[in-house]
Amino acid sequence: MLIDAHVHMWNRKTLPDKAILTYLEPIIAFKETYGHLFDLGFDGDMPFPDYDVPIETPIETMDKNNMDGMVVLATDFELVGGDRMTLEEHMEWLFQRCSVDDRFYPFIGVDPNRPNAPELIEKLVKRYSPKGIKMYPAVGFYPNEERMDAYWKMVDDLGLLVVTHAGMALEPLDEKYCHPEMMRPVAEKYPDMKIIIAHLGGKFHDELFPLMEACDNVYTDCSALQGWMPNETYMIKKRLDDAISRFPDRIVFGTDFPLYDERFSTMQFIREIEKREWESEKIRDDFYGNTMARLLGIL
């Protein structure tokens, strides 16, 4: 079984302009300096390159890799500038888009800064029956704040699987909220809640293993390890070896598709991962899909 546990389908109307401009700054600077020498194929108003991916693209990726599923993570940016589409419009767009193939498992996303966030979660769960919810603390909340109590209680009561971002964030988003350690009080208070810390903790990787050692309901995914390619590819194996040797049944395969796909396809990423020596077939099968399938309740 092969499941990509970390996939995005972005809609330009939901993305904060400032974050996109921050992302594009080095590209635009290169164009301004060297554009007279090279045809770079874009103008100064080029869009964020990874939104508006045709639905056929992830379907083709699943087909080419004999993939059993993609977990599609929604992020609620409406309150921080992605306000040309309401949250409910965004969720309707996403779930409708994913309905064309039953291998998609779309998750809802609700910013806890909304005053009616718990009620919105309940409403969206009744409407769409998602398997889980995506958290993005960089929009401006600490996961362990007291004001989050009603939010987490609703998530727990509804039995939602949680995927939370960890690591770097682009302005106007703030990575100070994205430390894995901040999830410890939540994981301890709700031991039945399953929580996936994305990106192996990202730039706060050193906080991940102590958290997982303390809380056996905390998992992680390997998405965005492609960021080490091609110059420091050895880090992919190192990070995976470190995690799998400690928590073989609590790390899941993920890519952050489509963020790296133009440079390093899912197939290339898998080939790189396959350079490691697997401790057993069970550990390999758990990593690629069985653990995520159990978390989704489909195995």
Language-model-derived ranges and their functions:
Residues 53-61, 89-94, 118-119, 180-183, ...:
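Alpha-helical scaffolding within the catalytic cores
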Residues 29-51, 56-82, 103-109, 131-132:
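Divalent metal-dependent hydrolysis catalytic cores, especially in the metallo-beta-lactamase
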Residues 1-5, 12-61, 122, 247-252, ...:
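Mid-to-C-terminal alpha-helical segments outside catalytic/metal-binding sites
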Residues 3-7, 70-72, 105-108, 131-135, ...:
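Hydrophobic faces of well-ordered beta-strands that scaffold small-molecule active sites
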Residues 194, 202-299:
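H/E-rich (His + Asp/Glu) clusters that bind or coordinate divalent metals
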Residues 100-101, 127, 190, 215, ...:
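Acidic-histidine catalytic/liganding microenvironments
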Residues 68-178, 227:
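Active-site gating/metal-coordination segments in enzymes
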Residues 10-13, 77-80, 112-116, 168-172, ...:
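Active-site environment of divalent metal-dependent phosphoester hydrolases
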